[in-house]
C-alpha cells in the first residue's frame, strides 16, 4: 500500500542521500510512494493469493498532487536510487551519486527548443539500440509526445516526479519515476543530452530501465524492441543482401509514412541477451566503464560557478568501445537510426542518399557524402541547404544508398499501421491481438520436429474472409502479416531468463472442420503439411512475416523451437481486409451418462448443498449442525445388492473385503477406504502404482458422500469403484510403457476421453497441479484429478438450475463446496 517515508529515515545500503524536500521549502518531511498491483491470465488464482489491501494503484496525477500538497519531492519505492536499480549480475566497484537535475546544474530544463535527435548522446551502457529508436521517434512529434507527455518541467509545479508512456504487449502503460539520476563526478553516467542542462532523454532512459527492472537489463538488444514499445507498431526485418530491388522505394515510403527505421552491421558473433553485442561480459563492461570514467574526470574549471546558468554542450564521455570500429568510420555490432532519404544532384546525375545517426553523438562515416567529404564543393549551394549539410561531429551523416547497402547488413522497419509496403496506396490494415502461454508439460510442445508434442501448442483459428483490392493482381489472395512476440524475457533476465527461439506454422483447416473450434489433434499434423510458416526460428523478442493466401480458414500454431520451454506471448495478425483471429478453445462441459433404465438416482451432498441457502456464515443452528456433523445425524441403512449368480467375482471380493473392514455398520471412513482400495488395486499386477494416498481417499468420500456423514456405505463404494475402473482403463491406454505414469501432454486427451471438455487454461492448471517435475502424472494423481473434476462439475450443475452456465453462491455454500471436496 502507499507508504510515506520520513525524511529522517536512513537511505538504503549503498545509496547516496537523495534530497526529499521541495527546493526552498521549509515545510514537508517526506516522500510519497506508490505500489503496483499484480495481474495476469489466471486472474482467479492470482487474485486469491494477493492480499486485499483496499488501495488502488495511484496515478501520476494523484502522486504529483500529493507531493505538491505536502511540499515533498517524490521518491520512487519501486525503482529506488541505489545499486538494485543499476546492476543485478554483480556489484559495481565504485559508488555512483544519485542526484536530481537541480543538483547537477543551474537552470535544469526538461526540453530545450524541442526534442530532437541531437539531444541523445550515449553514456556508459550498451543500449545503443534503445537510443537509436529514440532518435527515430523524434522525427514524428505526434508519436514523441505520446511517449513523453506534455506539461512536465523543473520550474512550474516541480515535485521531482515525471512519467512516460510505453506500449506493453497490447496496452499502453504509464511509468512513473522520480528524477534521481546516477552521476559520477557530477556528470551523468548514462544517456545525456548535447545540452548539459537538458534531461528529457536521461529521464526517458530511466523510465525504460524501470519498465525492465534495471539499467543493466537494457544492455544489448534490437532497435525494433524499443520502436515497438514507443509505437505499438509491427516490425519487419530485411537482410540487406537479400533485399528486394525496390528497397530504396520501400524505405522512402516508410519515412513518408512516419515509420521508424534502424540498421546495423553484423559483427560476426551470435549476439544474445547474455552478452553485449561483441560478446563482452558484464564484468568486463563494468571494468571498462570504470577506466573510462577515471580517464574523463572533470577538471575544476568544468564545474559550474555557483549562481551561474549552464546551457553549454555536455562534455561527452566516449562510450565503452565494445563494438568494432571500421576504417570507414562505421561501427560493427552497433545500432544506427535511419533519419532521412533524399535524392541529390551531383555532376548532373541524381544520387540516392541515406541519412543515418550514431547514438553516440560522434564517430561518423568518413566516405563519400560524409560531413568532411572533399567533393561537397561540387554540390550546388541550394542542394547543400536542402540536405542541411554542416561539418559538425554530432553523429549524423549522409552516405550514398549504394554505400549503405554495401556496408550494412540488417534493416528494421517499424510500421505504425502495418500499411502494405509493396503498394503505392496507403492502406489501413485490421489487427487482432491474442495472448497466450506455453506451459511446460501441457502446451509447450516445441516445433514440428517434435510430432508427439507439437499438436499441444496453443492454436489460433484465422478466417480470411475477403480478398485484397488490387486491380493489377488477378489472383484471389488475402494479404496478412503475423507477428509473434514473447513477453517479459528482458525483465526476467536477472532470474536467468534468455530469449527463446520462436516461430510459427500455418495450416489450412479442411472444409468439413470449418467453424469447429476443437483443438486439432496429433494425427492432423502428421498427415497435413503447413501452408506457410516463419522463415526461421530465431531468438528474438518478435518474429514477423508477410503472407499471401487464398480466402479460407487456417490455424496458426506458435511455438518455441525446443519443447518444454515455458513463457508468455502475444500473437498479432494484421490483414488488408476483414479477418477473424481467435484462440481455439473447447466449450467447457461434461458428457452426461445415458440412463439405460429407470432407477432412483443417488443424491450427492453437492447436489443438495443449496438446501443451506437460508443459513448465514455465523449461524450455529441445530439444522446447520445436523447437516454438517456426522455425530449429530444417524444414517439410514442402505439396501445391499443381493449376492446373485450374476454377481462377478470382483464384486463378491469387494463385498467380503468391505464387510471385514467396515464392521457392523457397513460404513467406511477415509482410512478404511484407503485400505480397501489398495488391497484390490494391488491385485492388478498390470497397473504399476504405489496405491492411493489418504488425501485422495478423502476426496473420493467427498465426491460420493450422499448425506454429509464423511463415510461411505457399500452402495456408494460400489458406485465409486465403477468410476475408478472406467478411469483406470483410460489411464492404462495412455500408460504405453507401463511405467505407472502417463505423460502430462497426454492428459488433454485422457480428460476428453473421460467425458470432460475443458479449455486451454484449465488444461494448463491441471498440469501445474498434478504433474511432477518430470512432467509425469501417476495413477493416484490421475484419479485425484478426475474425482475433483467430477465433483466440481456435479456441484456446478446442481446450482445451475436454469442451465445458463452461471451460478450464484453465498459464502457458506462456497465454503461448503470448496472445503469438502
From Swiss-Prot:
Skeletal muscle. Keywords: Calcium, Cytoplasm, Hydrolase, Metal-binding, Nucleus, Protease, Repeat, Thiol protease. Homodimer; via EF-hand domain 4. Interacts with TTN/titin. Interacts with CMYA5; this interaction, which results in CMYA5 proteolysis, may protect CAPN3 from autolysis. Interacts with SIMC1. Interacts with UTP25; the interaction is required for CAPN3 translocation to the nucleolus. Activated by micromolar concentrations of calcium and inhibited by calpastatin. Residues 73-417 form the Calpain catalytic domain. The active site is at residues 128, 334, 358. Ca(2+) 3 binds at residues 735, 737, 739, 741, 746. Ca(2+) 1 binds at residues 662, 665, 667, 672. Its EC number is 3.4.22.54. Residues 587-649 are annotated as: Linker. It is found in: Cytoplasm; Nucleus, Nucleolus. Ca(2+) 2 binds at residues 705, 707, 709, 711, 716. It catalyses: Broad endopeptidase activity. Belongs to the peptidase C2 family. The keyword tRNA-binding does not apply. Calcium-regulated non-lysosomal thiol-protease. Proteolytically cleaves CTBP1. Mediates, with UTP25, the proteasome-independent degradation of p53/TP53. Residues 1-34, 603-652 are annotated as: Disordered. The gene is CAPN3. Ca(2+) 4 binds at residues 800, 802, 804, 806. Residues 641-652 have a biased composition (Polar residues). SMART domains: calpain_III, CysPc, EFh. Residues 649-683, 692-725, 722-757, 787-821 form the EF-hand domain. Residues 624-638 have a biased composition (Basic and acidic residues). GO terms for cellular component: cytoplasm; cytosol; myofibril; nucleolus; nucleus; plasma membrane; protein-containing complex; T-tubule. This is Calpain-3. It comes from the Eukaryota. Residues 650-821 are annotated as: Domain IV.
Amino acid at each position: 500500500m502507499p507508504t510515506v517515508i520520513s525524511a529522517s529515515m536512513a537511505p538504503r545500503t549503498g545509496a547516496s542521500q537523495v534530497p526529499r524536500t521541495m527546493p526552498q521549502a521549509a515545510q514537508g518531511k517526506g516522500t510519497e510512494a506508490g505500489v503496483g498491483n499484480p495481474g495476469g491470465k489466471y486472474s482467479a488464482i492470482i487474485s486469491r493469493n494477493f492480499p486485499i489491501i483496499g488501495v488502488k494503484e495511484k496515478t501520476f496525477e494523484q502522486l504529483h498532487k500529493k507531493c505538491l500538497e505536502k511540499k515533498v519531492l517524490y521518491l520512487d519505492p519501486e525503482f529506488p536510487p541505489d545499486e538494485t536499480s543499476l546492476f543485478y549480475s554483480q556489484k559495481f566497484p565504485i559508488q555512483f551519486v544519485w542526484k536530481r537535475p537541480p543538483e547537477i546544474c543551474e537552470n535544469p530544463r526538461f526540453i530545450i527548443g524541442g526534442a530532437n535527435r541531437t539531444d541523445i548522446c550515449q553514456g556508459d551502457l550498451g543500449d545503443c539500440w534503445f537510443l537509436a529508436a529514440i532518435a527515430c521517434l523524434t522525427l514524428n512529434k505526434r508519436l514523441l509526445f505520446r511517449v513523453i507527455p506534455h506539461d512536465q518541467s523543473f520550474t512550474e509545479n516541480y515535485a521531482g516526479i515525471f512519467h512516460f508512456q510505453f506500449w506493453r504487449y497490447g496496452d499502453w502503460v504509464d511509468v512513473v519515476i522520480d528524477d534521481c539520476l546516477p552521476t559520477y563526478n557530477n556528470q551523468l553516467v548514462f544517456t545525456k543530452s548535447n545540452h548539459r542542462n537538458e534531461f528529457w532523454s536521461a529521464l526517458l532512459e530511466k523510465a525504460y530501465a524501470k519498465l525492465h527492472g534495471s539499467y543493466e537489463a537494457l544492455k544489448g538488444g534490437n532497435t525494433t524492441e524499443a520502436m515497438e514499445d514507443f509505437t505499438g507498431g509491427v516490425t519487419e526485418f530485411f537482410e540487406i543482401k537479400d533485399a528486394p530491388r525496390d528497397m530504396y522505394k520501400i524505405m522512402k515510403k516508410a519515412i513518408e509514412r512516419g515509420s521508424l527505421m534502424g540498421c546495423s552491421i553484423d559483427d560476426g558473433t551470435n549476439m544474445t541477451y547474455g552478452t553485449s553485442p561483441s560478446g563482452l561480459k558484464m564484468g568486463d563492461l563494468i571494468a571498462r566503464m570504470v577506466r573510462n570514467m577515471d580517464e574523463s574526470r572533470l577538471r575544476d574549471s568544468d564545474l559550474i560557478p555557483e549562481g551561474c546558468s549552464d546551457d553549454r554542450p555536455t562534455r561527452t564521455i566516449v562510450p565503452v568501445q565494445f563494438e568494432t570500429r571500421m576504417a570507414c568510420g562505421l561501427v560493427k555490432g552497433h545500432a544506427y537510426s535511419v533519419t532521412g532519404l533524399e535524392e541529390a544532384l551531383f555532376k548532373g546525375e541524381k544520387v540516392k542518399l541515406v541519412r543515418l545517426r550514431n547514438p553516440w553523438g560522434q564517430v561518423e562515416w568518413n566516405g563519400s557524402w560524409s560531413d568532411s567529404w572533399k567533393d561537397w564543393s561540387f554540390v550546388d549551394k541550394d542542394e547543400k541547404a536542402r540536405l542541411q549539410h554542416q561539418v559538425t561531429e554530432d553523429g549524423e551523416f549522409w552516405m550514398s544508398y549504394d554505400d549503405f547497402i554495401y556496408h550494412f547488413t540488417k534493416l528494421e522497419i517499424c510500421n505504425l499501421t502495418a500499411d502494405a509496403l509493396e503498394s503505392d496506396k496507403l492502406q489501413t490494415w485490421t489487427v487482432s491481438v491474442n495472448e497466450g502461454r506455453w506451459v511446460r508439460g501441457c502446451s509447450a510442445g516445441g516445433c514440428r520436429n517434435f510430432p508427439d508434442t507439437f499438436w499441444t501448442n496453443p492454436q489460433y483459428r484465422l478466417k480470411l474472409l475477403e480478398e485484397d483490392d488490387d486491380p493489377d493482381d488477378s489472383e484471389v489472395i488475402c494479404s496478412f502479416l503475423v507477428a509473434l512476440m514473447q513477453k517479459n524475457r528482458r525483465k526476467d533476465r536477472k532470474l536467468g531468463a534468455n530469449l527463446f527461439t520462436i516461430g510459427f506454422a500455418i495450416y489450412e483447416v479442411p472444409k468439413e472442420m470449418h467453424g469447429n473450434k476443437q483443438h486439432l489433434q496429433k494425427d492432423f499434423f502428421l498427415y497435413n503439411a503447413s501452408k506457410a510458416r516463419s522463415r526461421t526460428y530465431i531468438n528474438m523478442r518478435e518474429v514477423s512475416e508477410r503472407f499471401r493466401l487464398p480466402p479460407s480458414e487456417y490455424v496458426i500454431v506458435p511455438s518455441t523451437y525446443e519443447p518444454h520451454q515455458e513463457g508468455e506471448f502475444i500473437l498479432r495478425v494484421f490483414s488488408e481486409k476483414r479477418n477473424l483471429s481467435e484462440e481455439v478453445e473447447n466449450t467447457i462441459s461434461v458428457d452426461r451418462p445415458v440412463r439405460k433404465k429407470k432407477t432412483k438416482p443417488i443424491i450427492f451432498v453437492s447436489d443438495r448443498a443449496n438446501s443451506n441457502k437460508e443459513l448465514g456464515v455465523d449461524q450455529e443452528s441445530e439444522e446447520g449442525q445436523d447437516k454438517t456433523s456426522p455425530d449429530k445425524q444417524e444414517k439410514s441403512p442402505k439396501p445391499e445388492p443381493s449376492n446373485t449368480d450374476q454377481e462377478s467375482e470382483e464384486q463378491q471380493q469387494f463385498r467380503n473385503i468391505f464387510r471385514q473392514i467396515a464392521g457392523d455398520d457397513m460404513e467406511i471412513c477415509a482410512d478404511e477406504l484407503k485400505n480397501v482400495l489398495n488391497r484390490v488395486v494391488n491385485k492388478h499386477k498390470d497397473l504399476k502404482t504405489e496405491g492411493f494416498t489418504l488425501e485422495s481417499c478423502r476426496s473420493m468420500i467427498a465426491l460420493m458422500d450422499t448425506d454429509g456423514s464423511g463415510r461411505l456405505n457399500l452402495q456408494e463404494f460400489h458406485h465409486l469403484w465403477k468410476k475408478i475402473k472406467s478411469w483406470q482403463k483410460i489411464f492404462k491406454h495412455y500408460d504405453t510403457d507401463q511405467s505407472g505414469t502417463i505423460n502430462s501432454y497426454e492428459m488433454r486427451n485422457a480428460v476428453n476421453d473421460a467425458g470432460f471438455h475443458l479449455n486451454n487454461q484449465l488444461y494448463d492448471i491441471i498440469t501445474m497441479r498434478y504433474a511432477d517435475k518430470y512432467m509425469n502424472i501417476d495413477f493416484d494423481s490421475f484419479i485425484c484429478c478426475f474425482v475433483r473434476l467430477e465433483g466440481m462439475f456435479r456441484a456446478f450443475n446442481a446450482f445451475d438450475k436454469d442451465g445458463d452456465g452461471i451460478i450464484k453462491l453465498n459464502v457458506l455454500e462456497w465454503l461448503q463446496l470448496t472445503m469438502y471436496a
